[in-house]
From Swiss-Prot:
Function: NDH-1 shuttles electrons from NADH, via FMN and iron-sulfur (Fe-S) centers, to quinones in the respiratory chain. The immediate electron acceptor for the enzyme in this species is believed to be ubiquinone. Couples the redox reaction to proton translocation (for every two electrons transferred, four hydrogen ions are translocated across the cytoplasmic membrane), and thus conserves the redox energy in a proton gradient.
Lineage, broadest ranks: Bacteria, Pseudomonadati, Pseudomonadota, Gammaproteobacteria, Candidatus Pseudothioglobaceae
UniProt KW Translocase keyword: yes
Similarity comment: Belongs to the complex I 30 kDa subunit family.
Name assigned to this protein: NADH-quinone oxidoreductase subunit C
InterPro entries according to UniProt: NADH_DH_suC, NADH_quin_OxRdtase_su_C/D-like, NADH_UbQ_OxRdtase_30kDa_su, NADH_UbQ_OxRdtase_CS
Subunit-structure text: NDH-1 is composed of 14 different subunits. Subunits NuoB, C, D, E, F, and G constitute the peripheral sector of the complex.
Keywords assigned by UniProt, alphabetized: Cell inner membrane, Cell membrane, Membrane, NAD, Quinone, Translocase, Transport, Ubiquinone
Species annotation: Ruthia magnifica subsp. Calyptogena magnifica
Taxonomy, superkingdom: Bacteria
Annotated membrane topology: Peripheral membrane protein
GO CC terms: plasma membrane
Name of the gene encoding the protein in the UniProt record: nuoC
MF annotations from Gene Ontology: NADH dehydrogenase (ubiquinone) activity; NADH:ubiquinone reductase (non-electrogenic) activity; quinone binding
UniProt-listed Enzyme Commission number(s): 7.1.1.-
Amino acid sequence: MQDLKASLIKVFGERHLVEAFGELTLIVDSQDIIKTCLKLRDFFYFDTLIDLCGVDYLTYGQSDWNGNASASGFSRGRNHQGSKDRHEQRFVVVYHLLSVSKNKRIRVKSFVDEAEPIIKSVTDIWASADWYEREAFDLMGILFENHTDLRRILTDYGFKGHPLRKDFPMIGEVEMRYDEDLGRVVYEKVSIEPNINVPRVIRK
């Protein structure tokens, strides 16, 4: 991995590369995503996109987060975070790439504007990005410019909003399901109470 890290630093610069927990993460400006991904594919042989998702940092570092917890076992230390630990930018698109021939992996992160979360599609670089980008659009509301079929992929017909956003309302919405007794589709009000079963941990 150190050889890959050194090569990436030569091309992209050290300040854009983060190494943590045995993984490399490349931070990329959204305007440079196509140029960067082409370099990763053509010069570093990352020929496979294995995952793409959106992340919402809206409540990152607020209540219910632990800042000091064991990385293994059952120990959980509690140290509530303050505003200094919150992300300056809200939405990020995360790409996980694999080089089959070199047996290397890398994560690419690109933050997008909160008011207009738009980034260019990478479907022309990796065809596997197609449904991943549709999922990120559906659940997070991130728009992928030049995607040829950017439709919802998981939510129901007529669904309003993007359900994985941290500010998505938990009450007042409706869901659709098939009622076997009535023999038709029905709409019911949704009321979901936030329930944290697994401690949220900020690892640095």
